[in-house]
């Protein structure tokens, strides 16, 4: 049974990492081989599947991660992150700083992939937490929750956009309903969950994070740092750039010559590269910092995220083995005939696929193809089907998803602490989202 094989594989992975203390990347590759064999994959295709998984994962993330680490390091070394932190503290105060971080993360998350937003915001949140002597996780977990909600629920993110088409839903309606549902979901899974987690898992909130990609933390005099405006614009330029590109792309006609150019420069990799070039000027050249010192910062930022990239690639290998091994097809056949509510079916299928395959996007897209035929004409609002699927696709982030390893490494958590905080948070987020969708379904 494929589900049992996957469960055993996850248990072996946890044993290797927690008990044997084997390197996480090596553990992921070993388990990928074992699960592939258990699923009955052609032995000659196992290596190709693992290579495809690593390449596909890093092909999406390596460029963004690398350029993001460079950008973050340049802003950090120049004191830009410190300036942003101090300004936010002065404007919002200690009591309201968590709310400020959540709102900013939610707005930024609409335009950015979860991984990109995390890379950009982590250094700023770290600086704020350090200045206020707060637990890093106190601000970091609500920030990540807001990013995850927008990733799963709101266009123009790939999964919500693609499944809107599959269900025949109006994108504007999905965005409107999505924001209405995403706001209470973010509050419950972010700040409210944070209060619960701080009491139940205090050890996790004593961790100081692992921002090795940004190098050693420096001390700054405020009057020697860049201004707030230039620091904020430089840090968030990828967000601004991609948001503007998305808007222009929607306004231009499908056959417009400028549409392809706008979409090209609005991709995460291109936007991050342009943002890095801006940072080289605003945080380097304009501040009379030598190119030798700038080059040193860039080199150190890359060398110190190498292992994290390998771990994320290993997670991609595990995910690809599950896909190629037919786990998704097995789940599809299981749910093919059912009399449950289409909204609940869509959420359940997406949740099971997410647990098995890891990728929220793959889970959502696969679910759309399976659940669309279950909708009788006019029986359910297509926009709510999109949101139910999105809610299911973000449940219980664990070892087969890159986001799990990013949160673990950035926040400096143990495996157990990552399950207690991040995996539990994403489960709360998913169930809350489903509840909001079902309530909306009663009145629509």
Swiss-Prot record:
Keywords: Cell membrane, Membrane, Transmembrane, Transmembrane helix, Transport. The chain crosses the membrane at residues 2-22, 24-44, 52-72, 106-126, 134-154, 174-194, 228-248, 261-281, 305-325, 343-363, 377-397, 424-444. Coiled coil: none annotated. It is found in: Cell membrane. GO terms for molecular function: gluconate transmembrane transporter activity. One of its GO terms (cellular component) is plasma membrane. One of its GO terms (biological process) is gluconate transmembrane transport. It is a multi-pass membrane protein. InterPro entries: Glcn_transporter (IPR003474). Disulfide bonds: none annotated. Belongs to the GntP permease family. PANTHER family: GNT FAMILY GLUCONATE TRANSPORTER (PTHR30354), HIGH-AFFINITY GLUCONATE TRANSPORTER (PTHR30354:SF22). This is Uncharacterized permease YojA.
């Amino acid at each position: 049974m494929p589900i049992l094989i996957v469960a055993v594989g996850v248990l072996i992975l946890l044993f290797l990492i927690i008990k044997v203390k084997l390197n996480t990347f090596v553990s992921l590759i070993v388990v990928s081989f074992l699960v592939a064999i258990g699923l009955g994959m052609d032995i000659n295709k196992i290596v190709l599947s693992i290579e495809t998984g690593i390449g596909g994962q890093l092909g999406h993330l390596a460029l963004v991660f690398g350029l993001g680490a460079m950008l973050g390091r340049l802003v950090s070394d120049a004191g830009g992150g410190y300036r942003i932190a101090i300004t936010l503290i002065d404007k919002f105060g200690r009591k309201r700083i968590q709310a400020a971080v959540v709102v900013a993360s939610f707005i930024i998350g609409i335009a950015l992939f979860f991984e990109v937003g995390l890379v950009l915001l982590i250094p700023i949140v770290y600086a704020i937490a350090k200045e206020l002597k707060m637990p890093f996780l106190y601000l970091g977990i609500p920030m990540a929750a807001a990013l995850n909600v927008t990733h799963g629920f709101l266009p123009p993110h790939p999964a919500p956009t693609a499944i809107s088409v599959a269900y025949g839903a109006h994108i504007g309606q999905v965005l409107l309903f999505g924001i209405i549902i995403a706001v209470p979901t973010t509050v419950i899974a972010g700040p409210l969950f944070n209060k619960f987690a701080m009491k139940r898992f205090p050890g996790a909130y004593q961790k100081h994070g692992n921002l090795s990609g940004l190098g050693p933390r420096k001390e700054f005099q405020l009057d020697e740092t860049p201004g707030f405006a230039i620091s904020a614009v430089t840090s968030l330029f990828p967000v601004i750039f991609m948001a503007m590109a998305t808007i222009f792309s929607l306004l231009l006609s499908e056959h417009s010559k400028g549409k392809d150019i706008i979409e090209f420069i609005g991709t995460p990799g291109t936007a991050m590269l342009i943002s890095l070039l801006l940072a080289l000027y605003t945080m380097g050249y304009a501040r009379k910092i030598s190119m030798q010192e700038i080059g040193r910062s860039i080199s150190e930022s890359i060398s110190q995220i190498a292992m994290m990239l390998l771990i994320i690639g290993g997670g991609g290998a595990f995910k690809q083995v599950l896909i190629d091994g037919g786990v998704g097809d097995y789940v599809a056949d299981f749910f093919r005939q059912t009399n449950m509510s289409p909204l609940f079916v869509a959420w359940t299928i997406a949740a099971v696929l997410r647990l098995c395959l890891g990728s929220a996007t793959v889970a959502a897209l696969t679910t759309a193809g399976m659940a669309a035929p279950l909708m009788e004409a006019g029986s359910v609002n297509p926009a709510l089907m999109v949101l139910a699927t999105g809610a299911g696709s973000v449940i219980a982030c664990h070892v087969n998803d890159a986001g799990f390893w990013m949160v673990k490494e950035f926040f400096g958590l143990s495996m157990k602490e990552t399950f207690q905080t991040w995996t539990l948070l994403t489960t709360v987020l998913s169930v809350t989202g489903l509840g909001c969708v079902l309530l909306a379904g009663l009145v629509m």
